[in-house]
């Protein structure tokens, strides 16, 4: 596997989606949880970024994960409703996954191998964000406590790069 475009994932409805459908877009791939202390800030700021840059080719791909303190116990339909109702935000939501361990998503295994974390590669908490360029290559990994607005410079640079 050489880029995120090589992966197929399941959307919130359980349908197969090829990430090659996003060729030419700049992606923020993020593991999300509804009951995390980081939820409000991340969803609010991701929505703001998408509102500004979607027209330029930015997409947010959200992968619910319940591996961290059980902070995403809901089903995908409830997660989608929560995010839409509370934040007026509609990221592209995918099926709930594991981001670490024996049952980890192949996509997140690839992301971690391409851009390891501080001290070790495992995803440490909810809202670890990967910025992916228009070519499907990972540009940068941002930790859970990095505010999405602090990614804006890197997002602008990525959006400026044409294929």
From Swiss-Prot:
Biological classification of the source: Eukaryota, Metazoa, Ecdysozoa, Nematoda, Chromadorea
Active site per UniProt: 36
GO annotation, biological process: cellular response to reactive oxygen species; innate immune response; regulation of peptide transport
Major site of localization recorded for this protein: cytoplasm
Any single Gene Ontology cellular-component annotation: nucleus
Source domain of life: Eukaryota
Organism: Caenorhabditis elegans
Family label: Belongs to the glutathione peroxidase family.
EC class name: oxidoreductase
Protein name, UniProt field: Glutathione peroxidase 1
Assigned EC number: 1.11.1.9
Recorded catalytic activity of this chain's protein: 2 glutathione + H2O2 = glutathione disulfide + 2 H2O
Annotated localization: Cytoplasm
Task of the protein: May constitute a glutathione peroxidase-like protective system against oxidative stresses.
PANTHER family: GLUTATHIONE PEROXIDASE, GLUTATHIONE PEROXIDASE 1
GO MF term (any one): peroxidase activity
Protein keywords: Cytoplasm, Oxidoreductase, Peroxidase
């Amino acid at each position: 596997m050489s880029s995120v475009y090589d992966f197929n994932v399941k959307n919130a409805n359980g349908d197969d989606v090829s990430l090659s459908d996003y060729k030419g877009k700049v992606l923020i791939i993020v593991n999300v949880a509804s009951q995390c202390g980081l939820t409000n800030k991340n969803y609010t700021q991701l929505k703001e970024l998408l509102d500004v840059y979607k027209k330029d080719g930015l997409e947010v791909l959200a992968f619910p994960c319940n591996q961290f303190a059980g902070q995403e116990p809901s089903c995908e339909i409830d997660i989608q409703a929560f995010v839409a109702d509370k934040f007026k935000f509609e990221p592209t939501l995918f099926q709930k996954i594991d981001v670490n361990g024996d049952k980890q998503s192949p996509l997140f295994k690839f992301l971690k191998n391409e851009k390891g974390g501080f001290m070790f590669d495992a995803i440490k908490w909810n809202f670890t964000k990967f910025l992916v360029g228009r070519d499907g290559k990972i540009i940068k990994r941002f930790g859970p406590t990095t505010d999405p607005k602090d990614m804006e410079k890197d997002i602008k640079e990525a959006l400026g790069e044409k294929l």
